[in-house]
């Protein structure tokens, strides 16, 4: 039973990963006090069975996530859109940062897994909804 549940979870998570990877750009929404903040992101990586995003610790988004780790991601691709509501959990391990930077080598000009700025987060308690104008929404939890 556990193997089946774990396999289904990975398959569902992969669908979210594939959507965000294909879209290339997604929008990450946070909150700063009572003001919503949204900005484009482009990193998505699977590491140790979790979906990760990356930013820099010096950016306002890092402070916003620290104050309130509940975020929402939105992207549009091929006539469908996805919304992912989740909590972001920082993973400060060099291995997690290296995996992200290996997946996005163009970021190595600005980031390094051993610097004090590179920051990666994995998604926890995530609910993704894939919608379109022609089909019923698909809800994915991971």
Kindly label every feature range from the protein language model:
Residues 18-32, 71-73:
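A short, Trp-centered hydrophobic/proline-enriched beta-strand micro-motif
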Residues 44-79:
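A short mixed-secondary-structure module that forms the rim of ligand-binding clefts
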Residues 2-6, 83-142:
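Charged, gly/pro-rich active-site loop segments
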Residues 1-25:
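N-terminal leader/targeting segments and the immediate start of mature chains
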Residues 2, 27-29, 42-50:
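Short, basic, glycine/proline-bearing loop/turn elements
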